[in-house]
């Protein structure tokens, strides 16, 4: 998603339970809040635009997100030499990289890890990418070891609005319709629906 700020300004936009691939970019004087979302390559053009990331899984270089805040996030940056910009704040975040990603952040609540497999249940190996099949669920051990500022697990399943893959609107997951109706005009239909309560 790209927003260049042109003649209008994106202010106080909220992205909740979203999966955004490629890039989420803000132009000048723009702001966005991302909650329990998976975002690839967030980018703000300068210090007049900012993001707020809460319980997100972020993939790519966060050094291009200026004047932004990160809380309870999991960050995966596959490039060495990247780090969070000094104009940002970060609390209780994990970065999956070998370098000191949080070197510009003064608090000591953030951690750098090198082992993806000890963090995610379904991690397939190699660099973390935004695959549709990836659930970003933490292992049972990681759920108790890596806690956010609110005491819940870091990442998209923690916080006040934990991600739930169950759709809020009913969705048909199975539908079998008989090829023919019976002699009295009845048609056999078998439907299964998945929805939140």
Annotate each language-model stretch with its function.
Residues 110-166:
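C-terminal accessory segments
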Residues 152-187, 194:
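Short, compositionally biased P/S/T/A/G/V-rich stretches that sit at domain boundaries
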């Amino acid at each position: 998603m790209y927003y260049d700020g042109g003649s209008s300004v994106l202010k106080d936009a909220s992205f909740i339970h979203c999966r955004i691939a490629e890039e989420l970019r803000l132009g000048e004087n723009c702001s966005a809040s991302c909650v329990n979302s998976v975002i690839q390559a967030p980018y703000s053009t300068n210090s007049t635009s900012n993001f707020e990331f809460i319980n997100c899984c972020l993939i790519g270089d966060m050094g291009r997100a200026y004047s932004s805040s990160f809380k309870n996030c999991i960050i995966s940056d596959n490039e060495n030499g990247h780090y969070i910009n000094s104009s940002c704040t970060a609390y209780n975040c994990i970065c999956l990289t070998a370098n000191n990603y949080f070197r510009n952040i003064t608090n000591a609540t953030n951690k750098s890890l090198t082992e993806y497999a000890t963090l995610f249940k379904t991690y397939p190996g190699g660099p973390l990418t935004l695959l549709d099949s990836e659930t970003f669920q933490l292992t049972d051990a990681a759920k108790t070891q890596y806690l956010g500022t609110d005491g819940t697990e870091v990442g998209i399943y923690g916080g006040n609005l934990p991600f739930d893959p169950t759709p809020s609107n009913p969705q048909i997951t199975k539908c079998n319709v008989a090829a023919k109706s019976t002699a009295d005009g009845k048609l056999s239909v078998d439907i299964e629906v998945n929805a939140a309560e």
